[in-house]
Amino acid sequence: MKKGFFYVLLSAAALPALAQKVAYTEYKLKNGLGVVLHQDKSAPVVAVSVMYHVGSKNELTNRTGFAHFFEHLLFEGSENIKRGEFMKIVSANGGQNNANTSQDRTFYYEVFPSNQLATGLWLESERMLHPIINEVGVKTQNEVVKEEKRLRVDNQPYGNFVSEIMKRLFTKHPYNWVPIGSMADLDAATLEEFRAFNKKYYVPNNAVLVIAGDIDIAKTKQLVEAYFGAVPAGAPVVQPQIKDVPITKEVIDTAYDNNIQIPAIMAAYRIPGMTNKESKALEMGSAVLSQGNSSRMFKKMVDDKKNSLQVGSFNYALEDYGAYITYALPNAETPLDTLLKDIDDEIVKLQNQLISVEEFTKIQNQFENAFVDNNNRMLGVAENLAAGYTFYKNTNNLNTELDEIRKVTRQDIMNAAKKYLNRNQRVVLYYLPKK
């Protein structure tokens, strides 16, 4: 989700790293399900994945956490898969599986030996066609989600920092809350509300099925039709189109964390969504500031002045907006305002001076290497094809993204910083130990 100690990367079977065009076949079933097939016979592995265009932004303000809850609930079983058997079937057939939820989408996947392609398709079609949503499953997964929140958020140092930032950065838009949501909202929800959410969003016309790996295209098309062709379409899904109120005056606030001894200073700016070119320019700018030990903020604050234990900046890229976040943890008794000033000084430089050619070349190489590495696995290819289909309305985005990165100029980085990273456009958060 976030860089540094905030990022989590998914992985599957590794394949040779090649920056080459990803060929694919794309079509749509009569029920509206998008289908993308990518053949790669370099290893006997296949990734079967479904991305639903539903995340926490599709929730009601008093029923938050539904999308993440369904990430868990839809593993409970179906009319043809007994409760608790889903993952056992995957494991018994030599596979691995998981799912993850963001503010904008939910992504389910299995990675199997390629001779188990039909098993993966059957499992995902069962999840889509007739999942079992009953009181037993809801109660069970409610406890699972509560335990996850306790481990990853409530009892995790700095675990609430994203939530505290987002609820101040967004006042009208549903990015105001994070996917884990409110346990009180989940407790208050009825079985009928859960079933209605499933019926509305987990439908073929709100999803894309991506299969990547050692497959035969013609045979795979037949299997897709056999397993998914009869799934009925749902009502058209309309994504929320909510514009937040512009931030025109610096917001300064304080949050407290029971799990920390070292405070932090954070500043967040609302920026354009992930498909905007300026978002990529800002992401490259953040790399100049804090990616690696030779980055500007690290060298200045950790190495030279030694006033910080950790510093960072990152573009939290989402569909409708993004959040550009900077942070620092003090070394010894360094005042938080001193750290904020040091970060601000570096942002001012980014706004008023072109980064050096050497820095620019370095971050271009970093981004290109990350791009190649991310597409070095069948699961990475599958997820990126799904993201192109879902967010860019262009599955081929995977093949053009590297060119778009190369098109970003030093001037673009400076212009984007000038436009979006101003003090009157931000939220400053003093994140302190709770006394």
Name what the model sees in each region.
Residues L73, L123, R127, E148, ...:
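Generic, well-ordered alpha-helical scaffold segments in large soluble proteins
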Residues H38, A43-S56, G65-F69, R83-M128, ...:
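M16 family metallopeptidases and their MPP-like homologs
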Residues M1-V22:
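Bacterial Sec-dependent N-terminal signal peptides
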